Amino acid sequence: MANKTVLFHKHLESNAKMVDFHGWDMPLNYGSQIEEHHAVRQDAGMFDVSHMTVVDVTGQDARDFLRKLLANDVAKLTVPGKALYGGMLDDNAGVIDDLITYYLSDTHYRVVVNSATREKDLAWIAKQSAPFSVTITERPELAMIAVQGPNAKAKAATVFTPEQNSAVEGMKPFFGLQSGSLFIATTGYTGEAGYEIIVPEQDAEDLWQALLNTGVKPCGLGARDTLRLEAGMNLYGLDMDESINPLAANMGWTIAWEPSDRDFIGRAALTELKAQGTEKLVGLVMEEKGVLRHDMPVFFTDSDGVEQQGYITSGTFSPTLGYSIAMARVPAGIGAIAEVEMRKKRVAVKVIAPSFVRNGKQAF
């Protein structure tokens, strides 16, 4: 029996095509994935992300615990509401999950983790928290709606209370705050401006309907995937997992090496991997016809004239650009050109940093 979010019936009302997503009944699309994608790039769209796991970490050791648990450093967070992105690593520096952590106070942090990794994450967090004076509280009674796109904030403003609107006025990216019953964050998974709104389950249907009434288009998992890939954002389980370290997943920027005496889980293994050199995650662009897909082999010749091989982790047709894009894990010596094997022949692709579209425009 699949889990259903509190918005399940709202999806059916909008004629969603429902699919199983890691044990959850979720909307794939509401008729046209392409239209939903363009709505987010050009106007405003919304996603039910209530399957995500919200965890509150509280107690006198909350800060010290998260400094041990995460490769990024929550000590960087000094302004209430500020958030950071990073990886939770195992002892071998494999990525258990990627997550966002909000700093609410020195004794209260909010962590949002992926749904597919929920049980594994909660077990790991519980185990690692044992020596610390902290309380780990999962918040299943909270739903979450992401409102994304160039007009998302303006449309959300029409459903917020005056108090909520003044609270979010001028809020910078990667912040979150509680106002009334809503936790409103300037985060997202699309490369557009907008909010991720955590809402009590009993209020979620009304909020969804109010956003629908202001012309925010409901969007499914299909558009969510093409949008995040255009933005060069990783999907856990495809672009990285426990067999991959963050340096090989374009997450090097999320590792806080300083201060050097912060002994986060996985640090020793990661230091060794960094010294050895690792593979890297790059972006691929193919302007010829065809679609780059997960697991297709990638070939290039290194500076010594030796052929090297990698593979595509995520690939799709980019509705914004009009051709195919992908992320690929490859040996570090790759240049600006490579080849992908598709339909038994090799096709030339451009190699770029993995960011294709930001704020509606080509990013490379």
Curated annotation (Swiss-Prot):
Record's catalysed reaction(s): N(6)-[(R)-S(8)-aminomethyldihydrolipoyl]-L-lysyl-[protein] + (6S)-5,6,7,8-tetrahydrofolate = N(6)-[(R)-dihydrolipoyl]-L-lysyl-[protein] + (6R)-5,10-methylene-5,6,7,8-tetrahydrofolate + NH4(+)
Q: Name one GO cellular component term.
A: cytosol
This entry's Gene Ontology molecular function terms read:
aminomethyltransferase activity; transaminase activity
The protein's enzyme class:
transferase
Q: What is its EC number?
A: 2.1.2.10
Tell me, how does this one assemble?
The glycine cleavage system is composed of four proteins: P, T, L and H.
**What does this protein's UniProt record list under function?**
The glycine cleavage system catalyzes the degradation of glycine.
Checking HAMAP family in the record gives:
GcvT
Q: What is this protein called?
A: Aminomethyltransferase
User: Which source organism?
Assistant: Shewanella denitrificans (strain OS217 / ATCC BAA-1090 / DSM 15013)
